[in-house]
Amino acid sequence: MKYREIADGIFLDRPNRFIAHVDVNGTVETVHVKNTGRCRELLLPGAAVRLEVSDNPKRKTKYDLVAVRKQELGWVNMDSQAPNKVVGEWLSKQNFDLVRPEFAYGRSRIDFYMEKGEQKYLLEVKGCTLEVGGIGYFPDAPTERGVKHLHELAQAQRAGYRCAVAFVIQMEGITEVRPNVGTQPEFGPALAEAKAAGVRVLFLLCHVGRDSLEIVEQREG
């Protein structure tokens, strides 16, 4: 996945979930943050950030904040739309007969439905931007929706689908993701239930480029 044009900046502050103030070449710009999560461990005053430049003259903000440099870790892509985009590209190379995004199942919309021959597959995508002590954690904010998705995947697996949840690790040097039970206590048991039902847990390791995000390795959880 590539961004059209990238500019560099220095993060100043974040008045609310949707916007931030960033120093771009000495000018304070109001930018859109492409992640409504807290990201408090990432968006620290003085942190280097990368901004996607918009070509839409009707927008209120010229830039989207898509990546931030974390000390001792490197660049973290924090664009919440990026995981589904890179997984869509990745799936297109996996020899499925059919790949369909946003598939309705039960009371949820699962990110991807695939077919290969007579077999049907479901894949739910989760982006990971939270790192503590060299380990990735999900979620970084409360998500009842994420818990519901795991229950739906377990049910679908029992019904004959082949199901997986894929954690897209949006930073380099991290190879596994663990449940952040401190933020969402139910997520850990729901993930364990899904695994017990046969749902695969995938860790998708990424290369974070200046203007790109690319899946480079798949590991089993």
Give each language-model segment a name.
Residues 9, 110-140, 153:
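Conserved catalytic cores of phosphodiester-cleaving nucleases, focusing on short active-site segments
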Residues 16-21:
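Short aromatic-glycine-enriched beta-strand elements
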Residues 27-41:
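Beta-strand/loop nucleic-acid-binding surfaces
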Residues 37-50, 154:
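Short nucleic-acid-contacting surface segments enriched for D/E, G, S/T with interspersed K/R
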Residues 40, 72-101:
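Acidic-basic catalytic patches of nuclease active cores, encompassing PD-(D/E)XK
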Residues 134-144, 154-183, 205:
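Nucleic-acid nuclease catalytic cores
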Residues 170-221:
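Domain-level recognition of nuclease-like catalytic cores that cleave nucleotide substrates
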